[in-house]
UniProtKB/Swiss-Prot annotation:
InterPro entries: FluC. One of its GO terms (biological process) is cellular detoxification of fluoride. It is found in: Cell membrane. This is Fluoride-specific ion channel FluC 2. HAMAP family: FluC. The keyword Nucleus does not apply.
Length: 108
């Protein structure tokens, strides 16, 4: 049963992730997806939900929406191109927005 909840949440999170990639070019989609996943995750954590809903919303939806592997690929490309400052800026912005979004989400 848990698998079905995770899969259902993952379907919707993955669809939203794909939709963001259609709306925003490149790194903007990754930044938007990760920030939105952090905001939603912070909000869902604050609700003290039953375990199955936590699996559905946090592990499934937020897990599929966030895209840390794409972030690693994008940071790796900047690193290989020796674009140190853009890499550090992108990494800093991602973590700053992510942590801020979790903080905000927990207070909504």
């Amino acid at each position: 049963m848990i698998f079905l909840y995770a899969a259902l949440g993952g379907f919707f999170g993955g669809f939203l992730r794909w939709s963001l990639a259609q709306l925003f070019p490149g790194k903007r989609a990754t930044l938007a997806a990760n920030t939105l996943a952090c905001l939603a995750g912070g909000f869902f954590v604050s609700l003290d939900l039953p375990h199955l809903y936590t699996v559905l919303l946090i592990a499934g939806f937020c897990g599929a929406l966030s895209t840390w592997s794409t972030l690693a690929k994008e940071l790796g490309q900047l690193l290989n191109e020796k674009k140190w400052w853009p890499m550090l800026g992108y990494l800093s912005l991602t973590f700053t927005l992510g942590y801020s979004a979790v903080f905000l989400g927990m207070r909504l």
